[in-house]
Structures are given as structure tokens and as C-alpha cells.
């Protein structure tokens, strides 16, 4: 996690927790002038548009005061949705049994993309059972992006 994201987590996580929400993850990036700060939130009852608006106002107020991001950016508050991105190591166990798509930052065993059934977090990495039935353990530090997927 980049320093900016660490700072954002430190500012936003306690705020959302106090409001009864879970900070699922943070994405920040884009070209200069079009930077986007996307914050994923969740709650046991799910997320409504009103929840997103409430959290947006509270988070925006904190970010205006603390000013952790230089320059202009757009703040977007979102639920993780059904094709939920995975940000936390604990989520690999939490969503075991679900379909997952993983993209790596560098090739591992000759590949950068994996897809299959999430089997949890093992000693050597994220366990995924691929379509042909083989289980792979992907090193956690190589995972650039992971997302649950819906399969018909």
C-alpha cells in the first residue's frame, strides 16, 4: 500500500467504523487533473445511495481539513458490489468458495492472470482452484488486483 493510501486508511477507517460502516478498500489514481479517489464501503445491511452520500459528506470534511492529497481529485464513495474487489488479506478467507479473478504485478509460473474458485489464504499465498481442478497458491505480494466474479 502506498504512503498516501496508508494515510487515507488512518484518516478514514476510524471515521467509518464510528459511523457503523466498514472501509473495504481505497483506489487512487488517474492522470493529473483527472485523479479519482474511490472509497469502497460496506455494512451488514448493505449500502444504499443515502449511505454513500452520508459517508461522502463526512469523508470530504475530513479530507478538506487534513488535506492528505495534493492537487485536485474527484471523491467517489461506492459499495463493493457483487464483483467485489479484494483489498485485505482476511478477505481471501472470508470469501472462500466464491469465483475470483486475479491479476499479478509480475509473471509467476509463466502467467499474470488466474481465475477459479477461491480456496482461502494458505501458508504460501492465496489458494485458487482452477477450472481443470488444479490448486495454485499465488504469492500475496505479487497480487496487483483481485476481484470476485459472478459466474452464471
Curated annotation (Swiss-Prot):
The keyword Iron-sulfur does not apply. GO terms for biological process: ribosomal small subunit assembly; translation. CDD domains: YlxS_C (cd01734). Disulfide bonds: none annotated. Pfam families: DUF150_C (PF17384), RimP_N (PF02576). Keywords: Cytoplasm, Ribosome biogenesis. It comes from the Bacteria. Gene3D superfamilies: Ribosome maturation factor RimP, C-terminal domain (2.30.30.180), RimP-like superfamily, N-terminal (3.30.300.70). The keyword Chaperone does not apply. It is found in: Cytoplasm. NCBIfam families: PRK00092.1-1. Belongs to the RimP family. Required for maturation of 30S ribosomal subunits. This is Ribosome maturation factor RimP. It comes from Alkalilimnicola ehrlichii (strain ATCC BAA-1101 / DSM 17681 / MLHE-1). The gene is rimP.
Amino acid at each position: 500500500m502506498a504512503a498516501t493510501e496508508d494515510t487515507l486508511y488512518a484518516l478514514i477507517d476510524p471515521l467509518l467504523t464510528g459511523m457503523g460502516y466498514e472501509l473495504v478498500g481505497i483506489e487512487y489514481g488517474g492522470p493529473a487533473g483527472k485523479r479519482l479517489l474511490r472509497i469502497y464501503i460496506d455494512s451488514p445491511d448493505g449500502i444504499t445511495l443515502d449511505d454513500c452520500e452520508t459517508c461522502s459528506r463526512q469523508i470530504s470534511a475530513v479530507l478538506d481539513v487534513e488535506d492528505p492529497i495534493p492537487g485536485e481529485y474527484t471523491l467517489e464513495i461506492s459499495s463493493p458490489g457483487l464483483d467485489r474487489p479484494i483489498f485485505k488479506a482476511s478477505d481471501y478467507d472470508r470469501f472462500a468458495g466464491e469465483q475470483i479473478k486475479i491479476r499479478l504485478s509480475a509473471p509467476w509460473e509463466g502467467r499474470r492472470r488466474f481465475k477459479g474458485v477461491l480456496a482461502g489464504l494458505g501458508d504460501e499465498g492465496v489458494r485458487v482452484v482452477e477450472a481443470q481442478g488444479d490448486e495454485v497458491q499465488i504469492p500475496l505480494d505479487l497480487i496487483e488486483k483481485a476481484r470476485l466474479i459472478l459466474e452464471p
